[in-house]
């Protein structure tokens, strides 16, 4: 029997009230790891050390495993402690009817996001910005302006305001609402100051509640052609606040950016198991959230980085598989261990840019330097590198890509425990003119030379 109607966030809410009861510990510690392990064995998944896959049969098995993971497990609602299940037809209905392209921004600054494929010769969209990193109120505008001034950058992804009017943006407080609005307004002003007033932005990042997220759609703030973020929870979980936010975005005809960062070494387990969950999470973004695009970001449980050998492999296989078997549009976010003004940070970001570009990502989003947790440690220079490397990578043979990545990751992977802290934005840039220091330009050139030595042609 066919499904009654296409699934949406309202159906999710209704099913979250009546679905099968389950404790969160049972979900996290039993259902997710056991099913991921079972599916890895069932489909004989073995990535054989490739960052970007060349085995289409193995990719097809991965897609089947990810689809089955979502179908059989469903999604756990953390508020009701119940499991929301979809039918197979509901999942296929969502996959078959995704947005195949959309526009971010307005006027001459608008960019068209459309499907890429594995080994595509076209450079992906570069979404430059702090990527949820904490940014001081007094430099919030110049930090974001440093990205808008970069021609390699197409859209902006917001940072988190550490304060507004000198007060912390406590969730569900008036200050959170003010911060969510101010975040968007200041970034729009930063883009205008850079001569790109129509640039699309992606957020909000400061707010942690539904009321904060919804309030960012305001006069002078986010508009429908900006990416509006909603986040899934690890792994295959969601709360009802997020479902309410989705309802607002849908009702406002907003571009919806569904975000989630699968954890390697966490509930899902190893490389293949985490990739199965990543594929399931991609698909869920379009069933549950009616997403325009999904923002990925496999992260290492120990190092807090998206640029490790393991997380790059997960990202490469998940994206290539999604790209090969669906029309889903996908991005990835960047969290290097090292801080700005260091070669390691730039090389880490480069490795991920190579992986994402070659595996068919539509959007690269970053860079949250110093793992995205240190205040003011992110600048436009890291996004420049992300973009330049993407341009150099597009169209290169996948066999060559895997060789370059193996050598590149080897240059920095022994330094995670002692990654260089780097410098703050205020130390990397002239804050008044929003231009990088001579020191940073020298560091940048050094990293670029190492990439050229590995075979990239800029």
From Swiss-Prot:
<protein>
    <recommendedName>
        <fullName>Monomethylamine methyltransferase MtmB1</fullName>
        <ecNumber>2.1.1.248</ecNumber>
    </recommendedName>
</protein>
<dbReference type="Pfam" id="PF05369">
    <property type="entry name" value="MtmB"/>
</dbReference>
<dbReference type="GO" id="GO:0043852">
    <property type="term" value="F:monomethylamine methyltransferase activity"/>
</dbReference>
<comment type="similarity">
    <text>Belongs to the monomethylamine methyltransferase family.</text>
</comment>
<keyword id="KW-0484">Methanogenesis</keyword>
<dbReference type="InterPro" id="IPR036655">
    <property type="entry name" value="MtmB_sf"/>
</dbReference>
<keyword id="KW-0669">Pyrrolysine</keyword>
<dbReference type="GO" id="GO:0015948">
    <property type="term" value="P:methanogenesis"/>
</dbReference>
<dbReference type="GO" id="GO:0032259">
    <property type="term" value="P:methylation"/>
</dbReference>
<comment type="pathway">
    <text>One-carbon metabolism; methanogenesis from methylamine.</text>
</comment>
<comment type="subunit">
    <text>Can form a complex with MtmC.</text>
</comment>
<comment type="function">
    <text>Catalyzes the transfer of the methyl group from monomethylamine to the corrinoid cofactor of MtmC.</text>
</comment>
<dbReference type="InterPro" id="IPR008031">
    <property type="entry name" value="MtmB_MeTrfase"/>
</dbReference>
<keyword id="KW-0489">Methyltransferase</keyword>
<keyword id="KW-0808">Transferase</keyword>
